[in-house]
């Protein structure tokens, strides 16, 4: 990503960016992968925030499976603060290809989320696993039902009781 492109991203409003990237979704993927690999600075964190907002607002993730890989990578990356938004995307996707990624995000400890007494990321991830409704998702929820954290256990048990887990598994992505 060039300096001019970064300037465009940081100076444009969300509507302009959404319109631009709806026409060029591959460019959004390319930029997101590039920025993820850069040294983290206030600017790169801002750009990641903008991109995640665009992915959610533009529902890019529903239109293009190529977003799964970068979202999975970002979910593992502790150098930004968008994990809850990524969990929301996973909840909306409920993709069997992302089961391991969703599970790993559920149990990931993030210093910046210490204040979150309700473990919202874990809640969204357990919903994602429940909505996925496959035997592999059930296995992950059963593991979470044994988690040392009482809320995570409760979230997992709620999803286990809510779904039948009879949907067909597909090859996992991660």
State where each predicted segment sits.
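Glycine/proline-rich active-site loop of Rossmann-fold NAD(P)-dependent oxidoreductases
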Residues: 80
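Structural detector for internal amphipathic alpha-helices that build alpha-solenoid repeat scaffolds
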Residues: 8, 15-26, 42-63, 73, ...
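Amphipathic alpha-helical scaffolding segments comprising HEAT/armadillo-like alpha-solenoid repeats
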Residues: 25-38, 61-77, 95-111, 134-146, ...
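Extended amphipathic alpha-helical repeat scaffolds
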Residues: 1-11, 168
């Amino acid at each position: 990503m060039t300096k001019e492109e970064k300037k465009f991203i940081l100076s444009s409003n969300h509507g302009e960016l959404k319109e631009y990237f709806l026409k060029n979704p591959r460019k959004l993927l390319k930029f997101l992968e590039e920025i993820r690999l850069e040294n983290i600075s206030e600017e790169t964190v801002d750009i990641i925030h903008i991109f995640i907002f665009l992915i959610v607002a533009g529902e890019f993730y529903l239109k293009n499976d190529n977003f799964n890989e970068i979202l999975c990578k970002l979910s593992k990356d502790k150098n930004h603060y968008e994990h809850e938004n990524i969990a929301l995307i996973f909840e909306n996707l409920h993709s069997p290809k992302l089961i391991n990624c969703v599970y790993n995000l559920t149990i990931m400890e993030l210093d910046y989320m210490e204040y979150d007494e309700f473990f919202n990321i874990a809640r969204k991830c357990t919903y994602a696993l429940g909505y996925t409704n496959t035997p592999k998702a059930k296995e992950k929820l059963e593991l979470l039902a044994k988690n040392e954290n009482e809320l995570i256990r409760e979230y997992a048990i709620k999803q286990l009781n809510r779904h039948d887990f009879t949907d067909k598994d597909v090859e996992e992505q991660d």
